[in-house]
């Protein structure tokens, strides 16, 4: 999993509330179990005007020239609602999204996202609206995020956010669940050995 310490990238506003996991990655694309290859299907029904994904919907912000190569999304409340499919953060990460800023996230999506290296940042609704409005007006769409400081830097504004220490450390060190387990392999083996001795 890629470390997240400081990231600066183009931010794309998605002015929708309750974006669900079926909108993020529709069910017909959930056939693979690898994390790769889902990015091209991200927001399929919004990004394309045909099922063959051959014609882009140019009214959708991610397809617009100024938001090409976006690595940050700014959206509205309850992002990631719906089913618990882990393919949703896989698709976002595979597309190149490193962080999502919103007033709130569905709990299961949030945990899945953080576990896959995708930072979820909760700001107030007013703060999100302020960022969205400025993104739409400004030529410079770049936002800087410091997970070390737990701050978002945009123009001359600084927005503070919170994240629990466990997920923050995992993201800073680039540790997914498997890597985290391997990091503590020696302690786990020692615990298992002591437990077996006790049972005997």
From Swiss-Prot:
<dbReference type="GO" id="GO:0009098">
    <property type="term" value="P:L-leucine biosynthetic process"/>
</dbReference>
<dbReference type="Pfam" id="PF00694">
    <property type="entry name" value="Aconitase_C"/>
</dbReference>
<comment type="similarity">
    <text>Belongs to the LeuD family. LeuD type 1 subfamily.</text>
</comment>
<dbReference type="InterPro" id="IPR004431">
    <property type="entry name" value="3-IsopropMal_deHydase_ssu"/>
</dbReference>
<keyword id="KW-0456">Lyase</keyword>
<dbReference type="GO" id="GO:0003861">
    <property type="term" value="F:3-isopropylmalate dehydratase activity"/>
</dbReference>
<dbReference type="InterPro" id="IPR050075">
    <property type="entry name" value="LeuD"/>
</dbReference>
<comment type="pathway">
    <text>Amino-acid biosynthesis; L-leucine biosynthesis; L-leucine from 3-methyl-2-oxobutanoate: step 2/4.</text>
</comment>
<dbReference type="InterPro" id="IPR000573">
    <property type="entry name" value="AconitaseA/IPMdHydase_ssu_swvl"/>
</dbReference>
<comment type="function">
    <text>Catalyzes the isomerization between 2-isopropylmalate and 3-isopropylmalate, via the formation of 2-isopropylmaleate.</text>
</comment>
<dbReference type="InterPro" id="IPR015928">
    <property type="entry name" value="Aconitase/3IPM_dehydase_swvl"/>
</dbReference>
<dbReference type="GO" id="GO:0009316">
    <property type="term" value="C:3-isopropylmalate dehydratase complex"/>
</dbReference>
<comment type="subunit">
    <text>Heterodimer of LeuC and LeuD.</text>
</comment>
<protein>
    <recommendedName>
        <fullName>3-isopropylmalate dehydratase small subunit</fullName>
        <ecNumber>4.2.1.33</ecNumber>
    </recommendedName>
</protein>
<keyword id="KW-0028">Amino-acid biosynthesis</keyword>
<dbReference type="InterPro" id="IPR033940">
    <property type="entry name" value="IPMI_Swivel"/>
</dbReference>
<keyword id="KW-0432">Leucine biosynthesis</keyword>
<keyword id="KW-0100">Branched-chain amino acid biosynthesis</keyword>
């Amino acid at each position: 999993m890629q470390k997240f310490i400081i990231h600066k990238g183009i931010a794309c506003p998605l002015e929708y509330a309750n974006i669900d996991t079926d909108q993020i990655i529709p069910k017909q694309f959930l056939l693979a179990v690898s994390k790769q290859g889902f990015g091209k299907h991200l927001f399929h029904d919004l990004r394309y005007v045909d099922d063959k994904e051959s014609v882009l919907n140019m009214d959708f912000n991610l397809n617009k020239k100024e938001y090409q190569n976006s690595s940050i999304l700014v959206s509205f409340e309850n992002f990631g609602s719906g089913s618990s499919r882990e393919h949703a953060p896989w698709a976002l990460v595979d597309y190149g999204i490193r962080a999502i800023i919103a007033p709130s996230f569905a709990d299961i999506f949030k945990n899945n996202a953080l576990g896959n290296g995708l930072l979820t940042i909760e700001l107030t609704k007013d703060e999100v609206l302020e960022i969205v409005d400025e993104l739409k007006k400004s030529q410079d769409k770049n936002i800087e995020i410091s997970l070390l400081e737990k701050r978002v830097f945009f123009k001359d504004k600084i927005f503070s956010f919170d994240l629990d220490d466990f997920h923050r450390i995992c993201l800073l060190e680039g540790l997914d669940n498997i890597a985290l387990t391997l990091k503590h392999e020696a302690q786990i083996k020692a615990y298992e050995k002591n437990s077996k001795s006790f049972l005997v």
